Amino acid sequence: MAPDESKLQRPTGVLQRAPSGHLGPEYKRNDEKPSATVSTKVAHENVTILPQTPQLIALLTMIRSKTTNRADFIFYSNRINRLLVEEALNHLPVLPSTITTPVAGRTYAGVKFQGKICGVSIMRAGEAMEQALRECCRSVRIGKILIQRDEETSRPRLFYDKLPEDIRDRWVLLLDPMLATGGSALMAIDVLLGKGVPEERILFLNLIASPEGAANFAQRYPKVRIVTAFVDEGLDEKNYIVPGLGDFGDRFYTL
């Protein structure tokens, strides 16, 4: 079922003031470190924002800049995507696993992941995040969902989905780099739930989110875990994320 956009928290065009922080090595004083914009905080327990480290902010600075060429945009986006996948894997359940090392038969008490995972990309921008998932999880299954806005109703419409047959038995990493109003992502969640995937087994990964989109998601699906690199100031009158980075799909695939 398509989400009723009239029930979503709508943008007002009034942006939150972006917070700032001093970034640099911990051994330096704040007056020796530059001040930079960091993520807006949100009060939703199911939203995880990556630590606002100098590395992450430097990577985000590169992909936000309008002068960054396509090759660099792809390279730095992939680095952030890798950080997102690594963080998402931290939210999966594990089981105890004791192994024997090659050193004199010594044992090591460790853990192993519980259950199977798969990725699902919201086409086409979400496909840009698949490489990072494959680099972290060998032979991972990846499904696809195509959702586009209906020109007559202005509501998201499902055009296509191809998902693993046993997806209901897997943990799902849903991939889409930008979370604006959340309309398309909410429909994607509906598709997954319709296939029998439990809500608490879905993790939604994105590079940049708006406070409005994060709130819509958290309120409608409080058991879905959102993992994002940055929550921006908000949405403008055209529902563009501000300050944003432009059209991710265009910059990754064509520009």
Language-model-detected regions and their locations in the chain:
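PRPP-associated nucleotide enzymes
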Residues: A2-L255
